């Protein structure tokens, strides 16, 4: 922990005042209070690590292992069961669906055939447990924003063959930038006074909740952590098997960058360790180089495989000092700061940590309604086991780029504007602006733009086939 000796007198006083104020916040546990003060102390001591650009090396295939070089899997179902008995699946479930106009946890947005993200996750694990006679548990890490709703939602899975456990990530007070006081002490006692400190918090929260010890007692060895909105983040035994054989304590799945991913974090070799390099850590003069697909060819999918005993060892030693991400916000006109950490940045603290360079199919996030259009279309199919699989009929390995105007931003509006989702198997790009409505059975091919003039409602008729066209009015269809 940052002590007064590493701080200027002014910062030491700031931290002491903050300690006194936080001590009186009864909404949070002692673990949360000390975790928060620890984080702020590190932030004030300015321990942010500066990257020496000349020391960055491209990781070798030993460090970032190509997927096809992973150890081969046994075909024996008994061996598969042995592997699965060591596994826990953890989904990061702290996010709300607000950016897509939904209330409640993002994981309950319907993805396809009336099934939500959470329904699909449960189906997948149910199928594994049934097929191999194993018992892979599902853990959901909620935030205080999603906890109550999630408890109600998981009741519907009471009859499934899965143990579902929920726990909360930490709840920290937002800091008022002006005087470094906790926002809840300023009379803002509602949810706006607090924040969840990023998914780097998964490790201490797993420990503090008691879940980590309970899992270790059941003989579990590895946790597969992924965002609940990544439809490609399914259990992969090849990765798990490789980690167990090679005693790798941590594995980050990376995949080749496309132009859409230039801001994503990448893995580098730095002073003999593999570590995550995020755009925020890159000196200004090197940002364009960081974004180049030539030099930094891979990016972090946030699918992580981590050894449970190693998490316990490092959390107990207070060794997981990930880079702090300062996230400035404004609440009711008051400038506040929230300090966060990312789970991927923990890679450098684990022994024999590696990356696995996986196929792009393992990264299928739904961040906006444009992504929802992709996964609800004929570009993908849904299997009985809950897997969203790309349609082999599409010859182009990359997905079409889709830009929808603000009229489509909310899920309800998006669904209302499509009588049915168009066929996009041969689409390269789609850009839609203005008050546009799609009929049923529409087919889009090549490069298509649809732009309704201001104040004009533009309807694409049922059954229309539009190939390589710019449509600005009914006469263009």
Curated annotation (Swiss-Prot):
Taken from the UniProt entry, a GO cellular component term is:
cytoplasm
Q: What is its EC number?
A: 2.7.7.9
Q: Which reaction(s) does its UniProt entry say it catalyses?
A: alpha-D-glucose 1-phosphate + UTP + H(+) = UDP-alpha-D-glucose + diphosphate
Broad class of the protein's primary localization: cytoplasm
The reply to whether Ribonucleoprotein figures as a keyword in the UniProt entry is no
One Pfam family per UniProt: UDPGP
The effect of residue 329 to Q is: Increased Km, Vmax like wild-type
- Taxonomically, which superkingdom? Eukaryota
Positions that bind UTP: 92-95, 106, 169, 198, 229, 367
Where in or outside the cell it occurs: the entry states: Cytoplasm
Q: How does it assemble?
A: Monomer.
This chain's protein is named UTP--glucose-1-phosphate uridylyltransferase
**Which organism's genome codes for this protein?**
Solanum tuberosum
């Amino acid at each position: 922990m940052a002590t007064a000796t590493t701080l200027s007198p002014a910062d030491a006083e700031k931290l002491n005042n903050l300690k006194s104020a936080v001590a009186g916040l009864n909404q949070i546990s002692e673990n949360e209070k000390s975790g928060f003060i620890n984080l702020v102390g590190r932030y004030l001591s300015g321990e942010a690590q500066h990257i020496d650009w000349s020391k960055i090396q491209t990781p070798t295939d030993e460090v970032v292992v190509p997927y096809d070089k992973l150890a081969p899997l046994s075909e024996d179902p008994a061996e598969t069961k042995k592997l699965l008995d060591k596994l826990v699946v953890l989904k990061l479930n702290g996010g709300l669906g607000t950016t897509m106009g939904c209330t409640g946890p993002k994981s309950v947005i319907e993805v396809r055939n009336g099934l939500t993200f959470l329904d699909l996750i449960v189906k997948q694990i149910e199928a594994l447990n049934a097929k191999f006679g194993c018992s892979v548990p599902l853990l959901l890490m909620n935030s205080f924003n999603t906890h109550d709703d999630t408890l109600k939602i998981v009741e519907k899975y009471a009859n499934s063959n899965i143990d579902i456990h929920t726990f909360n990530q930490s709840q920290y007070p937002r800091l008022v930038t002006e005087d470094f006081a906790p926002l809840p002490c300023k009379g803002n006692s509602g949810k706006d006074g607090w924040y969840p400190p990023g998914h780097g918090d998964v490790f201490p929260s797993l420990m503090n909740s008691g879940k980590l010890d309970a899992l270790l007692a059941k003989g579990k060895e590895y946790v597969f952590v992924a965002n609940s909105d990544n439809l490609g983040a399914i259990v992969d035994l090849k990765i798990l098997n490789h980690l167990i054989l090679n005693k790798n304590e941590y594995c980050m799945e990376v995949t080749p960058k496309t132009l859409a991913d230039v801001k994503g974090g990448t893995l580098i070799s730095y002073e003999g360790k593999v570590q995550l390099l995020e755009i925020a850590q890159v000196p200004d003069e090197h940002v364009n180089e960081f974004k180049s697909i030539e030099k930094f060819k891979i990016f972090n999918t946030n699918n992580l495989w981590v050894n449970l005993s190693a998490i316990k060892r490092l959390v107990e030693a207070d060794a997981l000092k990930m880079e702090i991400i300062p996230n400035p916000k404004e609440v009711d006109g008051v400038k506040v700061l929230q300090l966060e950490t990312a789970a991927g940045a923990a890679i450098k603290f684990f022994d024999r940590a590696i990356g696995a360079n996986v196929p792009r199919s393992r990264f299928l996030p739904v961040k906006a309604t444009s992504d929802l259009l992709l996964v609800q279309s004929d570009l993908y199919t849904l299997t009985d086991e809950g897997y969203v699989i790309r349609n082999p009929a599409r010859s182009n390995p990359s997905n079409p780029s889709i830009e929808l105007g603000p009229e489509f931003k909310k899920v309800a509006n998006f669904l209302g504007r499509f009588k049915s989702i168009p066929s996009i198997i041969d689409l390269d790009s789609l850009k839609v602006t203005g008050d546009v409505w799609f009929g049923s059975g529409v087919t889009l091919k090549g490069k298509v733009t649809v732009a309704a003039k201001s104040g004009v409602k533009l309807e694409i008729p049922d059954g229309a086939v539009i190939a390589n066209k710019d449509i600005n009015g009914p006469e263009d269809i």
